[in-house]
Regions:
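Short loop/turn segments at beta-alpha junctions that line or gate ligand-sensing/allosteric surfaces
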Residues: 145
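Charged, low-complexity intrinsically disordered terminal segments
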Residues: 2-138, 148-156, 165, 169-466
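Phosphate-binding P-loop/Walker A region and its immediate neighborhood
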Residues: 141
């Protein structure tokens, strides 16, 4: 018996070791830029000289972000697609669940796609989520769930965040679906950005069709498992609970089901184009980074807003290539303010390499950590979405960005970036440091310094996973 147990233990140990080695070592072998995709970029028109059919509204406020989501869901007549990396059954996540549940009760078809890790962490035991998932016309897909069959692919996550309504409008950005990013909370939050896109051409908008096609592809991936909620013995009470939450939302926001000023409250754009990294749960070609590099080829000024920077040598080469012909500015959270310890720690290790690319860096001391991901290319193009300037977003995760040809949006975001720069410590490529007019210095306490000193050593072998 002891020999059998010993053999079982050895087999389990070897399997666990294999899982760890595959998940740590495989991401080290990053895919190179895709030549076929490079050709596609050259054949794609990212600008137009006249206004197109798709109109936009830029959402930078967390409470407004919740309101627009509720309006979109509340006015849906036929179909809703919600794809999100991190949905939680907290206060504002539950408000979304309640709105979706009410829409389902009216016969609206709902498809909900969630990343497998966060579904397991935050929704598996949620009665509200199970109640919604058990509705007849609600389908739930879980991307790359954490199961024995998927253990060798645990690194490949779905980082998308978008909402599609009735094939006539969508919202896409960097916000997750929880209290950190939605609602009127004032503590423990992040700032972020969404773009609401309204199509005036009755479902023929170019980027809307691109996003719908993308969703169909990822929904049909073999790594997506279909889940159906289990209605509990108290499911009637739970349905009533969600309806009560929705009723309270209608009292607070009177136009959730009657709002109709979509065209009036949005701005025209010349063109919107969706770019992405692919849908498979596997190593990705760096398509989003390729697109940013291509769009910046003839630029004179490029601003990159990212929560943090975690680059390999190939990514540093891209930044250096941009800085060789353009003024390159990178705005990121200061270590003293950032909410991601891995990103902060890697910055401490890699700061000199980032500056060596020729980029000027702005260490932002905002009131709240900034989770926004955006690239401004001269005064016309804005690239907005879920892509962080790190190896995970570049080579491992699914990512979506919108390339928007709109001088007005570019100016709006540029104004926000100017304010962020005033709240930052500017570090020029030559090492010269200057505090912005609104910069408020914060000193790390000894515990935080010690914590980062330890992490600086620990993360070196696994920085490709952060």
């Amino acid at each position: 018996m002891k020999k059998i147990l010993k053999r079982i233990w050895k087999v389990c140990f070897c399997f666990l070791l294999m899982v760890i080695l595959v998940n740590v070592l495989e991401p080290l072998f990053c895919r190179k830029p895709d030549e076929t995709y490079a050709k596609k970029l050259r054949e794609t028109e990212f600008t137009a000289e006249t206004a197109g059919a798709e109109r936009i509204y830029c959402i930078d406020d967390n409470e407004e972000a919740l309101l627009w989501r509720l309006r979109m869901i509340g006015t849906a007549k036929k179909s809703i697609v919600l794809s999100t990396f991190d949905l939680r059954a907290d206060e504002n996540g539950t408000k979304l669940l309640a709105a979706l549940n009410h829409a389902a009760s009216k016969g609206v078809k709902i498809q909900l796609l969630i990343d497998g890790i966060y579904q397991q962490l935050f929704l598996a035991k949620s009665r509200d989520f199970q109640t919604l998932a058990s509705c007849e016309n609600v389908e739930v897909g879980v991307y790359n769930p954490v199961t024995p069959a998927h253990l060798l692919k645990v690194n490949y996550r779905m980082h998308d965040k978008y909402l599609i309504i009735d094939e006539k409008m969508y919202l896409l950005g960097g916000r997750n679906s929880n209290d950190i990013f939605l609602g009127d909370q004032k503590k423990g939050i992040n700032e972020d950005r969404d773009i609401l896109v309204y199509d005036t051409s009755e479902g023929q908008g170019e980027s809307l069709l691109q996003l719908e096609d993308y969703f169909h592809k990822i929904w049909d991936e073999s790594c997506v498992s279909r889940k159906k909620g289990k209605a509990s013995s108290g499911s009637i009470d739970e349905q009533q609970h969600l309806e009560e939450i929705y009723a309270s939302l209608l009292e607070k926001y009177h136009d959730l089901e009657t709002y109709s000023a979509w065209e009036k409250d949005t701005e025209e754009t010349n063109k919107i184009t969706l770019i992405h990294n692919g849908t498979q749960a596997g190593r990705k070609a760096p398509q989003v980074l390729q697109a940013i590099q291509y769009l910046s080829e003839n630029a004179k000024h490029v601003i990159i807003q990212t929560p943090y920077v975690i680059c390999n040598d190939d990514m540093y080469e891209v930044l250096q290539g941009i800085a060789d012909h353009a003024k390159l500015q990178i705005v990121l959270n200061a270590v003293e303010k950032g909410s991601n310890p891995w990103g902060c720690t890697d910055y401490l290790n890699q700061k000199k390499k980032i500056l060596k690319t020729g980029a000027d860096v702005y260490e932002l001391m905002n009131d709240y950590p900034v989770h926004t991901k955006a690239v401004l290319i001269d005064e016309r193009l804005s690239v907005v979405g879920s892509y962080n300037l790190d190896m995970r977003s570049t080579y491992l995760d699914t990512e979506l960005m919108l390339v928007i040809d709109s001088k007005k949006l570019n100016q709006q975001i540029r104004s926000t970036e100017a304010d962020y720069m005033e709240k930052s410590r500017e570090i020029l490529a030559n090492g010269q440091e200057t505090d912005g007019a609104k910069y408020q210095e914060k000193v790390l306490n000894w515990k935080k310094k010690f914590y980062y000193d330890v992490l600086k050593i620990m993360i070196r072998p696994i920085r490709q996973l952060l």
